[in-house]
């Protein structure tokens, strides 16, 4: 609801040119590229619940800040921070669905992705309509309301988790465990091929 088309129109209203609009729209994706790998690994180490809670709060509350933005640099920075939500939430959410439905994993993941795509379909339509009829602030506040609803729904869930894999304090044990996870994935040719195929698809989609 925030990202398209409202974000580009809002950036344009602040004086952004085409190149700056492209940067503002895509900067949250940069955050995702940088942080999804460590975020997913940390969810394996410490459990999904903590990262899911951080992610859903980081997603739900920033829209309330957008109406107070009047500077392109501040907007770019806020988009970078807002991108943390997707980077933190998405890997843990997919892993949680896979954990909950081990025997019907394909159907569960299909349902999950269909729901996310439905939101991606309805959000731009609703956001564009609100921005046109009531202004940018109304669109952003509405996005924040939906985000708060998501927070309330998520915090009502009770997820059982195994104990953390790393009990020692300090950064070194965590980094060592993350390294084991990355190495295991890097050695799996099928995962790499599937991931590369999806990356190529996204490049074509964004061209």
Where are these regions (language model features)?
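Membrane-interface helix termini in secondary transporters
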Residues: 40-41, 45, 129
């Amino acid at each position: 609801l925030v990202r398209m088309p409202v974000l580009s129109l809002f950036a344009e209203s602040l004086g952004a040119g085409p190149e700056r609009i492209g940067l503002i729209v895509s900067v949250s994706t940069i955050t995702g590229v940088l942080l999804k790998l460590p975020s997913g690994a940390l969810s394996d180490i410490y459990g999904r619940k903590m990262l899911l809670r951080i992610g859903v709060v980081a997603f739900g509350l920033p829209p309330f800040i957008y109406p107070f933005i009047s500077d392109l640099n501040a907007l770019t920075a806020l988009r970078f921070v807002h991108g943390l939500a997707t980077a933190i939430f998405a890997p843990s959410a997919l892993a949680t669905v896979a954990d909950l439905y081990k025997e019907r994993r394909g159907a569960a993941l299909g349902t999950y992705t269909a729901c996310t795509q439905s939101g991606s379909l309805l959000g731009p339509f609703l956001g564009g309509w609100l921005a046109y009829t009531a202004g940018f602030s109304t669109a952003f506040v509405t996005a924040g309301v939906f985000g708060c609803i998501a927070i309330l729904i998520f915090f009502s869930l009770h997820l059982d988790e195994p104990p953390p894999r790393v009990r020692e304090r300090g950064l070194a044990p965590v980094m060592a465990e993350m390294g084991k996870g990355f190495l295991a994935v890097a050695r799996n040719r099928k995962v790499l091929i599937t991931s590369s195929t999806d990356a190529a698809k996204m490049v074509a989609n964004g061209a």
